[in-house]
């Protein structure tokens, strides 16, 4: 007791016995959060914002089209809206369409974009409503989608899976995802050093009208402004003078009056002096001479150089800082701040980190589509203007009606092409990106879900730079630390963590007003001197200077109180930067943020009472935000906060509490049980393999006709689950089976991670899978009124039965469901006309069109069964026939399996059950795994999973293996002992071969195993004779073309090294492309059938065997006027 008293001496007994306040059920906030935000909601929210808000802004910015030909004519957009997805049945008859129908019929799931316009026709003014101008592909589960707000029963009627995440598009029947794109944030000053170590600052400005980049460079201690519209760098002082700050003293005051700042800025002032520039006019003239001449189209009054320079400064340099009526005050201060930052960075080498995640913005589908739509809409309008300019001046009967000239396909095709190819090349925004969209991978439910949270950074994969690839501390909680691919894309492709939310743009008007009320002073009212006082902080809003504040701490705390009370949007963040003396307020889109519980007076604001109300359904997540119990923090604001991971680590400085620590992992890493007991790269491997595991795709998987679909015949829930598994509904659509594993060495076939499988388990369906492939064909109509036909099967003349190739065809020429189909058998006996174009005048064409056979045949080494045949029509009104082919495969030697800990292995041996070892309760293992896989891999999580699984089976309950928590090993082992098993999880095992007990106890229990998509049947390839290439007469290459295996240059060198010359001859010529060739001994050229065309004789012609490729090379060289001659000599001389 005395020792205790010394330790807790200062505390009273009452304080000692008071319980630490813990919120037991606080993880219940997660499902509530995931209902409203997170995972796929990012894409959906962003798309909704685009089609409900952003598209109207784009229309407002380009609302009027006028023509130079007729000043009276105009076209004005009054409103624009996106409708509901539909499909045109016949001319002008539409009906609503479901996503599943678009998938089956290879159509685009899109909705009409309609506008209300007002325009002139002749002298009258006309208003037209609901005029379609194109079609917009619709994201599934967005506000305009058919599936929004439906019950599970209605989902079933629409053939959709209620667990399907949505957030993707269906374009031409293919599911496409727009990946999240990572960008450096716009409108922020970034100070960095170049390769030589010179410090400079750069700003990428971006507004709705213009995008440009401005650089501040230092050369020989002088400061210059660099911009691509200027032909050379311009001294910074001249820029200040051109903006109207003519006195040197005021310039220095703006930049800073400290000694070292003034010393650093001195040379720049002298340079301006040398250039003899003192007034604003002189400065503007100097800049005007340095402007790059743009080719001006069309007339228009020529601007003087001074006007041109002033325009340039106002609108192009630092575009995002607004200039009203040439009042350059704000822009001057911004430029001064840039100079000051560079000077300070030179002094103490504090350059910004480009990889810091607060400097990054993520672009979502909505932002990318809005850029694309803006580009297409402007093109559409300029096309209209062009037509108006052409048509109005012409004399004709009817008046010019612009509606007749609106081409709908322009916007439609632009959207569809961009999404289906993934190429966003918009000249207008200097944007050229490939691979923005990807096909949604439907290998398993997890691969589809994991694709929704993927972030792609626009960085060349080829450069081996470690900076952008490494794990940044600022990514904590925002990005998953484990889920990134291995290889060249490592660290460039990232995934969001479980609770991350990406913000969308917000109106900044209210924030500006509020800041003014909280004591932010306008910059225009201050002299330069006041800006560099030590207690004056600059206030930035989204990169623009808002004003200055004397008491920044009060501003920040009041601002946060207002946000918690719900007066400001919950996603606005405010943070201070003490080194640069700034307060940053951000309300722009693309910032990463996540929710935290607020801590007041060392107690979390959320209590157990709140959690009970949540469980009973009185509260939802929004209520927690409004009552200031939970708030969102972004990366920059996290730096000002002190966040505790658990309740018992809260101290007096703590401001927030983490909701659940396991949410800093993403979707794929969340499936791993006990990941905190594994070596880090193992979790990364599992993240990649979990996406390749076969299982279930969705409740509608039997109705889908995909190009390739792998399904497990009997998937099971994992015995050891995690909180994440429940949150993302993995146990409703699992991918894997609980296998009983014995960790022991058995035979020599389990070396290097190979597994030994039990034949009896395979017979009972362990690891059995279905492989579905599809074959499809379209029957088109051609321009000359001919069309494709399907012919009936061809009958054998003698037996009056169909020939073998047509055995499985029905009378209509299409294969019948349920039939077994072998290689080279015909699935659809289609024939097409020989002439499909309209014939030329005067050419004789047979009256009756002639047909040639183009059958759709089955290609595959193993037989398949026809599951079903679908006949429909696609968007072009061509007939569409889709067949689904099925194979059932049982595991065989060489198939790949993996546990959930990155322990992959192939099946090395299949043993009959009577030879397998068994434990004393008579259980035989399904899998025997070699124990050498554990020590070097350090996957302790797998050992614990086996224990927890075993205890769970005996107890009849599921154990949790959640990251940083989960069931304790001690408790699990005590459960085992209670049921009469060994505390260590080891069993007494009898050998199946000798019937004697094994000399060691064997670690024995259930582990969740995944069957991966890599199967031997799809990879095995060998050939003796087979097809050859036409040009070189060598065997073709590749498994699909039944090609040969190439003996390359290195293999050739090896054989030369061994001196095996006959083997070389046999491999490189005789077995490849031997060719008899005639050579003339006199001139050394190739002859033909015993005659030399050059010597005009057959006296000296001999016959040789050389590779055909060699003969081809000689002839190709001859065609280039290089003549290789073959010298012949007698063999025996």
Swiss-Prot record:
Residues that bind Zn(2+): 1080, 1083, 1092, 1095
Enzyme class: transferase
Residues in C4-type zinc fingers: 1080-1095
Swiss-Prot/TrEMBL cofactor(s): Mg(2+)
Xref: InterPro entries: DNA-dir_RNA_pol_su2, DNA-dir_RNAP_su2_dom, DNA-dir_RNAP_su2_hyb_sf, RNA_pol_bsu_CS, RNA_pol_bsu_protrusion, RNA_pol_Rpb2_2, RNA_pol_Rpb2_3, RNA_pol_Rpb2_4
Keywords recorded for this protein, A-Z: Antiviral defense, Cytoplasm, DNA-directed RNA polymerase, Immunity, Innate immunity, Magnesium, Metal-binding, Nucleotidyltransferase, Nucleus, Transcription, Transferase, Zinc, Zinc-finger
Domain of life: Eukaryota
Cofactor note: Two Mg(2+) ions are coordinated by both the catalytic residues and the nucleic acid substrate to enhance substrate recognition and catalytic efficiency.
Site, Critical in trapping poly(dT) in Pol III-mediated transcription termination: residue positions: 429
EC numbers: 2.7.7.6
Binding positions (RNA): 186, 213, 438, 692, 896, 904, 1019
PROSITE patterns reported for this sequence: RNA_POL_BETA
Positions of Mg(2+) binding: 753
One GO location term (cellular component): RNA polymerase III complex
BP term (GO), one: innate immune response
Catalytic activity entry: RNA(n) + a ribonucleoside 5'-triphosphate = RNA(n+1) + diphosphate
List of residues binding DNA template strand: 1039-1040, 1046
Binding site residues for DNA nontemplate strand: 195, 432
Subunit structure: Component of the RNA polymerase III (Pol III) complex consisting of 17 subunits: a ten-subunit catalytic core composed of POLR3A/RPC1, POLR3B/RPC2, POLR1C/RPAC1, POLR1D/RPAC2, POLR3K/RPC10, POLR2E/RPABC1, POLR2F/RPABC2, POLR2H/RPABC3, POLR2K/RPABC4 and POLR2L/RPABC5; a mobile stalk composed of two subunits POLR3H/RPC8 and CRCP/RPC9, protruding from the core and functioning primarily in transcription initiation; and additional subunits homologous to general transcription factors of the RNA polymerase II machinery, POLR3C/RPC3-POLR3F/RPC6-POLR3G/RPC7 heterotrimer required for transcription initiation and POLR3D/RPC4-POLR3E/RPC5 heterodimer involved in both transcription initiation and termination.
Primary role: Catalytic core component of RNA polymerase III (Pol III), a DNA-dependent RNA polymerase which synthesizes small non-coding RNAs using the four ribonucleoside triphosphates as substrates. Synthesizes 5S rRNA, snRNAs, tRNAs and miRNAs from at least 500 distinct genomic loci. Pol III-mediated transcription cycle proceeds through transcription initiation, transcription elongation and transcription termination stages. During transcription initiation, Pol III is recruited to DNA promoters type I, II or III with the help of general transcription factors and other specific initiation factors.
Name by which UniProt lists this protein: DNA-directed RNA polymerase III subunit RPC2
């Amino acid at each position: 007791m005395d020792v205790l008293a010394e330790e807790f001496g200062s505390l009273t007994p009452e304080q000692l016995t008071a319980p630490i306040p813990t919120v037991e059920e606080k993880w219940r906030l997660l499902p509530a959060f995931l209902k409203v935000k997170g995972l796929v909601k990012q894409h959906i929210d962003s798309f909704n914002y685009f089609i409900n808000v952003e598209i109207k802004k784009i229309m407002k910015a380009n609302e009027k089209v006028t023509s130079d030909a007729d000043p009276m004519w105009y076209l004005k957009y009054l409103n624009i809206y996106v409708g509901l997805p539909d499909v045109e049945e016949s001319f002008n008859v539409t009906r609503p369409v479901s996503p599943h129908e678009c998938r089956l019929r290879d159509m685009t799931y899109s909705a009409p974009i309609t506008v209300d316009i007002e325009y002139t026709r002749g002298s009258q003014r006309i208003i037209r409503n609901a005029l379609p101008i194109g079609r917009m592909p619709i994201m599934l589960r967005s506000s305009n989608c058919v599936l929004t707000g439906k019950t599970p029963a209605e989902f079933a009627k629409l053939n959709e899976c209620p667990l399907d995440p949505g957030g993707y598009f269906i374009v031409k029947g293919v599911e496409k995802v727009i990946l999240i794109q990572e960008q450096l944030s716009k409108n922020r000053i970034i100070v960095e050093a170049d390769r030589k170590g010179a410090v400079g600052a750069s700003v990428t400005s971006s507004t709705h009208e213009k995008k440009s980049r401005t650089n501040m460079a230092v050369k020989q201690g002088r400061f210059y402004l660099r911009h691509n519209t200027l032909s050379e760098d311009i001294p910074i002082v001249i820029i200040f003078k051109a903006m109207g700050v003519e006195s040197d003293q005021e310039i220095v005051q703006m930049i800073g009056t400290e000694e070292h700042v003034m010393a650093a800025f001195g040379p720049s002032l002298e340079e301006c002096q040398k250039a003899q520039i003192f007034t604003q006019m002189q400065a503007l003239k100097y800049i005007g001479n340095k402007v790059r001449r743009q080719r001006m189209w069309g007339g228009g009054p020529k601007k003087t150089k001074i006007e041109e320079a002033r325009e340039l400064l106002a609108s192009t340099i630092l575009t995002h800082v607004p200039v009203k009526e040439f009042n350059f005050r704000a822009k001057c201060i911004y430029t001064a701040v840039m100079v000051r930052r560079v000077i300070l960075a030179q002094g103490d080498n504090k350059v910004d980190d480009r990889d810091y995640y607060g400097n990054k913005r993520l672009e979502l589908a909505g932002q990318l589509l809005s850029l694309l739509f803006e580009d297409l809409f402007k093109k559409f309008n300029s096309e209209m203007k062009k037509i108006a300019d052409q048509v109005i001046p012409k004399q004709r009967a009817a008046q010019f009606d612009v509606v007749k000239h609106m081409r709908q396909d322009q916007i439609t095709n632009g959207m569809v092409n961009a999404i289906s190819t993934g190429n966003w090349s918009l000249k207008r925004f200097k944007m050229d990106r490939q691979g923005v969209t990807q096909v949604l991978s439907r290998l398993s439910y997890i691969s589809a879900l994991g694709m929704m949270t993927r972030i792609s950074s626009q960085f060349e994969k080829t450069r081996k730079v470690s900076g952008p690839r490494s794990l940044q501390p600022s990514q904590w909680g925002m990005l998953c630390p484990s889920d990134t691919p291995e290889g060249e894309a490592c660290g460039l492709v990232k995934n969001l963590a479980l609770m991350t939310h990406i913000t969308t743009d917000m109106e900044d008007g209210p924030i500006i007003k509020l800041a003014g009320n909280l004591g932010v002073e306008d910059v225009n009212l201050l002299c330069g001197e006041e800006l560099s006082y030590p207690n004056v902080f600059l206030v930035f809003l989204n990169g623009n200077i808002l004003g200055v504040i004397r008491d920044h701490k009060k501003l920040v705390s009041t601002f946060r109180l207002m946000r918690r009370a719900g007066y400001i949007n919950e996603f606005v963040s405010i943070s201070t930067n003490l080194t640069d003396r700034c307060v940053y307020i951000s309300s722009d889109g693309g910032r990463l943020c996540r929710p935290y519980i607020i801590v007041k007076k060392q107690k979390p604001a959320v209590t157990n009472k709140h959690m009970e109300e949540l469980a009973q359904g009185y509260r939802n997540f929004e209520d927690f935000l409004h009552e200031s119990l939970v708030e969102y923090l972004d990366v920059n604001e996290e730096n000002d906060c002190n966040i505790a991971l658990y309740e018992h680590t809260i101290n007096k400085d703590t401001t927030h509490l983490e909701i659940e620590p396991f949410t800093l992992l993403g979707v794929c890493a969340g499936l791993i049980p006990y990941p905190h007991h594994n070596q880090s790269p193992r979790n990364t491997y599992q993240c990649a393999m979990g996406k390749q595991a076969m299982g279930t795709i969705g409740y509608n998987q039997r109705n889908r006709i995909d190009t390739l679909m792998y399904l497990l015949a009997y998937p099971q829930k994992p015995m050891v689950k995690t909180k994440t598994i429940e949150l993302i509904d993995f146990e409703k659509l699992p991918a894997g089976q609980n296998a009983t594993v014995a960790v022991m060495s058995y035979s020599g076939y389990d070396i290097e991670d190979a597994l030994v499988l039990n034949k009896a388990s395979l017979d009972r369906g362990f690891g059995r899978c279905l492989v579905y492939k599809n074959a499809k064909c379209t029957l088109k109509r051609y321009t000359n009124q001919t069309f494709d036909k399907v012919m009936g099967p061809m009958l054998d003349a003698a037996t009056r039965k169909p020939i073998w190739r047509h055995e499985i065809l029905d009378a209509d020429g299409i294969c019948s469901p349920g039939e077994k189909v072998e290689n080279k058998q015909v699935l659809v006996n289609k024939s097409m006309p020989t002439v499909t174009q309209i014939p030329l005048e005067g050419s004789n064409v047979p009256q009756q069109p002639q047909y040639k056979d183009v059958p759709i045949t089955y290609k595959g080494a193993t037989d398949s069964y026809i599951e079903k045949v679908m006949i429909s029509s696609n968007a072009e009104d061509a007939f569409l026939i889709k067949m689904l082919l099925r194979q059932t495969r049982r595991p065989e030697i060489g198939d790949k399996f993996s546990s959930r800990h990155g322990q992959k292995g192939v099946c090395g041996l299949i043993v009959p059950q009577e030879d397998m070892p068994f434990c004393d309760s008579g259980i035989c293992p399904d899998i025997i795994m070699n124990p050498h896989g554990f020590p070097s891999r350090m996957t302790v999580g797998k050992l614990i999973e086996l224990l927890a699984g075993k205890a769970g089976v005996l107890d009849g309950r599921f154990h949790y293996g959640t990251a940083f928590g989960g069931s304790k090993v001690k408790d699990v082992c005590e459960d085992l002992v209670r049921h009469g098993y060994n505390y260590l999880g080891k069993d007494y095992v009898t050998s199946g071969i000798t019937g004697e007990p094994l000399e060691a106890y064997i670690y024995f229990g259930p582990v969740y195993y995944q069957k991966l998509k890599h199967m031997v049947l799809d990879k095995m390839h060998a050939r003796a004779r087979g097809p050859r290439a036409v040009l070189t007469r060598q065997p073709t290459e590749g498994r699909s073309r039944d090609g040969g295996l190439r003996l390359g240059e290195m293999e050739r060198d090896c054989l030369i090294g061994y001196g095996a010359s006959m083997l070389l001859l046999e491999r490189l010529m005789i077995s490849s492309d031997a060719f008899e060739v005639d050579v003339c001994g006199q001139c050394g050229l190739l002859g033909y059938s015993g005659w030399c065309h050059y010597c005009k004789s057959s006296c000296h012609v001999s016959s040789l065997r050389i590779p055909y490729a060699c003969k081809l090379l000689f002839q190709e060289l001859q065609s280039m006027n290089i003549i290789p001659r073959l010298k012949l000599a007698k063999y025996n001389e």
